[in-house]
Structures are given as C-alpha cells and as structure tokens.
C-alpha cells in the first residue's frame, strides 16, 4: 500500500497522483500515491485503516473536507478558521495533523502572477507599485470560499466583500469573522450589487469560488465591475478557459486566470508539509497546462 493517497468521491479524475509523482521525482523519492473512493458510511474507517497500515499523508477532497476536520487530533490555525481539512499528516507520535492548503495555494499563485507582493500587499497593475488599500469581491460562500477566506484576510490593507445567492449564508460567515476580531470582511446583497450605480465600486480582485463554472453557468455579477485592470480569478479550471474567465476577458479585463496554478501550489505545500521539501511549481504547472491544451 502507498504511504500517500487522496480520499473523496469522485476521485477518478484527480490529478493529485501525477502531481505528487512529479514532485517526488524531483527529489528522487518514491512517487506512489493512491486514489481512495470513500462513502459517507466508510470514510472514517477507510481513513483510519489507511494510517493504521502505514499511511503517512492524505489529501481530502469533496465531499469530506469538513468530516476530516472533525477527526484530526491537531489542527493548523487556518484549518480551524475554515473548519475544513484537505491535508493530513501522521506525526511521529501517531496523532493526525490536519491542515488546509487551499488558501496557501491561492496566495502563492497570486504571488507567482505578481498580483500580490512577497509580503502580501496588492500590486497596482497600472504602475506596478504597492497599493495602499485593496477591495476583493468573493463570489460564493461554500466550502471553496471558506477555505481561502483566512488567507485573503491576511493580505495587507484589504477588504473582502462576499456575495452569494443565499444572502444569509454570506452574513453568517461575516458574523463569524467579526466575532473573532476580523473586521475587514463584509457581505453585499446580490440585488444591490447588480444595480448599476453600486456596480461602479472598484474591485481590485474578483474571485469566483462558486460552483458556477463547474456547471458552465455565469455567476450573477454585473459587467460594470470589470475594468482593464481588474484581476479576475476562477478557482476552477478546464481544458479551455472557464465560462467565468471568458466572460471577464470579453468585458475588458486584461488579467484573467483559472485555478490550475492554485491546484499545483496547494499540492506543493502539502508535499512540503509531509516531507519538509519545497518542490518546483513552474515545471509541473507548465506540464499540466500543456496537457490541458492538447
């Protein structure tokens, strides 16, 4: 049995085994990594069995990130804030450490793109200088959004604004962060955002964390939000531009990216958590991008 695996349902499409193999090859390590199809009934038993039989590291994908959070003995601060776990490491004392590397993956990809600086400040694309303040529009309030909010709030002098079809869900998230002293987050009623005069508010970064791209649907936002310098990021990706990326380009943004870089970056941090070695992301990212474009 491999010492590393991904647990989820479905997982047959997962790129994690190949990503892990490429990272491992860089350091001359064994690249074995399994796919584990779990169900609601057997997830806990399957995961515990994996670690009992010598497993060392696990990735967790949908729909088990919240359940994985509940079974870990120790948790990183960012996983506690998001109440989700996507990476587990078996520690020397046998306990399980849970982390969520999604946010780190996003931030590192934004740094790779030179959208934010090394020290977590927004970069003004019009002059390539550090911005004094920045506004982020986050579309969605589900698991994908929750996993990245903690790191977004750490960007210097930024405010995160959430929109969601169900306004109550966005409100609940904002209230939670306000209760722990994080005041640089708010939510906007979708109807207000769609009004032309409100849509003229400047957003430096718009992130689609909703499932709309997976369903080939557009999120309900106005084209008035888009300027040539608006950075647009879709957490999802495909073998061509997502519908959100296409829409942002069509409406004038010169900075539109899908989530493939985030996927590779979060996997790189998981690898670092397990092995203490930082793999090279650009080589793997370029290989996967080329494969998707075939």
UniProtKB/Swiss-Prot annotation:
Enzyme Commission number(s): 1.1.1.25
Binding site for shikimate: 14-16, 61, 86, 102, 237
GO terms (BP aspect): amino acid biosynthetic process; aromatic amino acid family biosynthetic process; chorismate biosynthetic process; shikimate metabolic process
EC main group: oxidoreductase
Alphabetical UniProt keywords: Amino-acid biosynthesis, Aromatic amino acid biosynthesis, NADP, Oxidoreductase
Active site per the UniProt annotation: 65
Residues at which NADP(+) binds: 77, 140-144, 235, 259
Reaction(s) this enzyme catalyzes, per UniProt: shikimate + NADP(+) = 3-dehydroshikimate + NADPH + H(+)
GO molecular-function terms, A-Z: NADP binding; shikimate 3-dehydrogenase (NADP+) activity
Pathway(s) where this gene product acts: Metabolic intermediate biosynthesis; chorismate biosynthesis; chorismate from D-erythrose 4-phosphate and phosphoenolpyruvate: step 4/7
One Gene Ontology term, aspect cellular component: cytosol
HAMAP family given in the database record: Shikimate_DH_AroE (MF_00222)
Its biological purpose: Involved in the biosynthesis of the chorismate, which leads to the biosynthesis of aromatic amino acids. Catalyzes the reversible NADPH linked reduction of 3-dehydroshikimate (DHSA) to yield shikimate (SA).
NCBIfam families in the record: aroE, PRK00258.1-2
Family of this protein: Belongs to the shikimate dehydrogenase family.
Subunit field text: Homodimer.
PANTHER family reported in the protein's UniProt record: BIFUNCTIONAL 3-DEHYDROQUINATE DEHYDRATASE_SHIKIMATE DEHYDROGENASE, CHLOROPLASTIC, SHIKIMATE DEHYDROGENASE
The protein's name in its UniProt record: Shikimate dehydrogenase (NADP(+))
Natural source organism: Blochmanniella floridana
